[in-house]
């Protein structure tokens, strides 16, 4: 079974379209780790594309605020303005769908493979707290110790990579891409006996100084995660943000990758 892992699309239609095009033929199921909306200028278009595809979606903090479930009191002024704009734009169907999203962590049905059953967890921030940012080994320590499955997929940080632990070994994962025609790719083997936190990165607003849209493919038979980076029409996405009169900073940071 191959899962296309999406996260932090943030209403960036151009980035999502580039990812879906690049991932054609690579997946059997789609898992969305949340923050599908917020910041970007195409919330309905993105939701209309994701809803029929995603087998499982967990909510993110922007999904909660943009749908009116949570207050924006902890958001910075730019994020707060974008969330209010998004709530005004959402169709009734998309608003209902966002409000119905489950809080992570959730576990998909166990996956039968030649090596036995495989269980994984999906969360937005962390398997312990949906709003936790896991950006360092210190952040990863408790989730790796306490999560209920050997592999947990998380988003929220907008940084592609992750962390793994086996016995007394602790490692941070940063992809070392093999580049071809602007598309970066790197495969991580999930070793027996390890516990893995896997972050596919952000599709719509990367913050690891690489502006390209990020996603991952999990192959349960091969026991691998392949990280991908794909270019997209940033100028068009920026133009949508400016046309919507959202803060200019939201457009500028797309090219900066931070």
Could you describe each region identified by the protein language model?
Residues 6-7, 30-35, 56-61, 123, ...:
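Active-site neighborhood of phospho(di)ester-bond hydrolases with catalytic His/Asp-centered motifs
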Residues 46-47, 52-110, 116-148:
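Active-site neighborhood of divalent metal-dependent phosphoester bond hydrolases
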Residues 104-108, 160-164, 214-218:
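Short beta-strand scaffold segments in enzyme catalytic cores
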């Amino acid at each position: 079974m191959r899962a296309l892992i999406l996260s932090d699309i943030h209403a960036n239609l151009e980035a999502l379209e580039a990812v879906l095009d690049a991932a054609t033929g690579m997946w059997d199921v789609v898992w969305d780790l949340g923050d599908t909306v917020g910041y970007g200028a195409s919330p309905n278009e993105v939701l209309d594309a994701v809803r029929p595809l995603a087998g499982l979606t967990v909510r993110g903090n922007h999904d909660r605020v943009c749908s009116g479930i949570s207050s924006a009191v902890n958001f910075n002024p730019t994020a707060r303005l974008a969330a209010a704009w998004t709530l005004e734009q959402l169709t009734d169907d998309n608003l209902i769908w966002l409000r119905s999203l489950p809080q992570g962590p959730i576990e998909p049905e166990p996956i039968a493979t030649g090596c036995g059953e495989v269980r994984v967890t999906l969360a937005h921030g962390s398997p312990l707290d949906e709003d936790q940012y896991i950006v360092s080994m210190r952040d990863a320590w408790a989730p790796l110790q306490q999560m209920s499955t050997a592999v947990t997929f998380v988003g929220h940080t907008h940084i592609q990579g992750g962390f793994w632990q086996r016995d007394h070994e602790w490692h941070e994962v940063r992809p070392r891409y093999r580049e071809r025609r602007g598309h970066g790719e790197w495969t991580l083997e999930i070793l027996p006996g390890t516990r893995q936190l896997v972050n596919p990165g952000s599709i719509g607003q990367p913050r690891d100084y690489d502006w390209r849209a990020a996603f991952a493919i999990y192959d349960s038979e091969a026991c691998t995660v392949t990280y991908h980076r794909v270019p997209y029409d940033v100028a068009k996405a920026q133009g949508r943000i400016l046309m919507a009169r959202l803060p200019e900073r939201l457009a500028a940071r797309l090219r900066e990758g931070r």
